[in-house]
Design a protein with these regions (language model features):
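Long amphipathic alpha-helical scaffold segments
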Residues: 46-58, 62, 326, 330-331
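Membrane-interface helix termini and inter-helical loops of multi-pass transporters
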Residues: 228-233, 295, 363-367
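Inter-helical turn/loop segments and adjacent helix faces that build the functional surface
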Residues: 194-201, 261-265, 326-329
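Hydrophobic cores of alpha-helical transmembrane segments in multi-pass integral membrane proteins
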Residues: 2-46, 60-86, 100-166, 174-193, ...
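Membrane-embedded alpha-helical bundles that constitute the cytochrome b-like, heme-associated redox core
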Residues: 49-58, 82-97
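Short helix/strand-bridging catalytic loops that position acidic/His residues to coordinate divalent metals
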Residues: 232, 369, 399-404
Length: 420
């Protein structure tokens, strides 16, 4: 119990310190740190960074493109998984080329890995578009952002291939997580330097992006430490951060940019915006909960934090819907905005379902474990998918400098809404 309290104090100090210096600046050290940060982004690793273009929007565009690749792969995997749930002997005729089907655990891991990579990559790309648009129109280093996207893609691919050759455990995945943490650290430095390009106040989307990346670095780091020291409560805390806070932070970053941009009206309520931002990073989201601890006190505290974790979700949804009311006609004619609003409407529903099933799992009762898994995957496919469509239809054209090529964007949005 002492370890998880210590980790929580460190987390609050880390995020609080970052928020303080982001708001107040670093004083006389600012110029030197900017220079050092730019050197690390543009000169290291030597030679490799020169392979990527430093054009405006290229970093975000690369993240979104790699995310789209994983999105298609995860959709295929999801279809195969659903097919085998319906017919366990499906595709047995492919056994001659190595196809085999046991209990579906490998397919579940494959789908979760590819879908998580898709949602994270696309949402991060969208958040980078919003962040750069608010700070001079480009990232501090577009080439470095592209390099990190390429590295993320390859590490994810490696994590899918390695289990074929060696037996992978939680410790091995935590080491891969540390590689992810190093790449996210580079993206955080890039985002901070981008934020320092102008003297304007930090925007809402930028806040969610920066705090989400910082929380992810901390979560991946303590996950590795928890696995090494066998501290299960610390690992649980890390999972709550990486699987709970980070996706929602990126979703909020995208939503708070897309809807006001399309409607032409500012965010409806500053108070709800601050509530969704503050409460997200001090509570536990109801998604992807696992068994926390056998200690009654920790279970009680966890249940309270999960209950409070509903408030930032509700605050965000209400804020988005009320912002849309300023110009609903513009939203209807924008497939990206329709996707963002639909996600904001459906998010509380998935949160309520995840709340009841997740609490059941968190206290060690496995009676609703399969339902919780279905809800969590549905959350990623539907809510994550809709926000990804919002990025692809509204923000990707800004990064690429092109318009949508076809008219099927609206149909795709409605198919995800009704089909999940």
């Amino acid at each position: 119990m002492i370890t998880v309290i210590f980790a929580a104090v460190l987390l609050v100090a880390f995020l609080g310190g970052l928020a303080h210096f982001l708001q107040r600046g670093l004083g006389d050290m600012s110029a030197a740190l900017k220079q050092f940060g730019m050197f690390m982004l543009t000169k290291a690793p030597a030679g490799i960074i020169d392979l990527f273009k430093d054009d405006d929007g290229n970093g975000a565009k690369t993240w979104i493109q790699f995310g789209c690749f994983w999105f298609v792969i995860s959709a295929i995997g999801g279809f195969l998984g659903a097919w085998h749930e319906y017919d366990a002997k499906a595709l047995d005729s492919l056994a001659s080329i190595g196809w085999s089907w046991e209990n579906g655990d490998a397919m579940t891991l494959f789908n979760l890995t590819t879908l998580s990579a898709a949602v994270f990559s696309i949402l991060l790309g969208g958040a980078l578009v919003a962040h750069s648009r608010a700070n001079g129109g480009r990232l501090a280093s577009e080439a470095n952002a592209s390099l990190m996207a390429f590295g993320w893609f390859n590490v994810t691919l490696l994590s899918l291939v390695l289990p074929i050759f060696i037996e992978m455990g939680d410790f091995h995945y935590s080491l891969i997580g540390m590689v992810y943490a190093a790449m996210v650290s580079s993206m955080l430095v890039n985002s901070l330097l981008t934020n320092a390009q102008t003297d304007s106040p930090t925007g809402v989307s930028s806040w969610f992006l920066i705090m989400g990346l910082a929380a992810m670095i901390f979560g991946l780091a303590i996950d590795a430490l928890g696995e090494i020291t066998n501290q299960t409560t610390v690992v649980w805390m890390a999972d709550a951060i990486v699987r709970g806070w980070v996706p929602l932070a990126l979703m909020f970053s995208v939503g708070y940019h897309v809807v006001p941009k399309v409607t032409g009206h500012p965010i409806w309520s500053g108070s709800l915006t601050k509530a969704s931002m503050l409460l997200l990073f001090v509570t536990v989201t109801p998604f992807f909960l696992s068994q926390s601890s056998t200690e009654p006190l920790l279970q009680s505290v966890g249940a309270i934090l999960v209950t409070m974790g509903m408030f930032p979700i509700l605050a965000f949804s209400v804020n988005m819907i009320c912002t849309m009311r300023g110009d609903a006609g513009s939203v209807v004619h924008s497939p990206g905005a329709v996707a963002a609003i639909a996600a904001a409407l459906l998010l509380p529903l998935f949160a309520v379902l995840a709340f009841f099933t997740g609490l059941n799992v968190m206290v060690g009762d496995a009676s609703l474990a399969s339902v919780a898994t279905t809800v969590n995957m549905g959350y990623l496919y539907t809510i994550g998918g809709l926000f990804c469509l919002a990025v692809m239809f509204e923000l990707y054209p800004l990064a690429s400098g092109n318009r949508l090529a076809g008219t099927s964007a609206g149909l795709a949005t409605w198919l995800v809404i009704f089909g999940g």
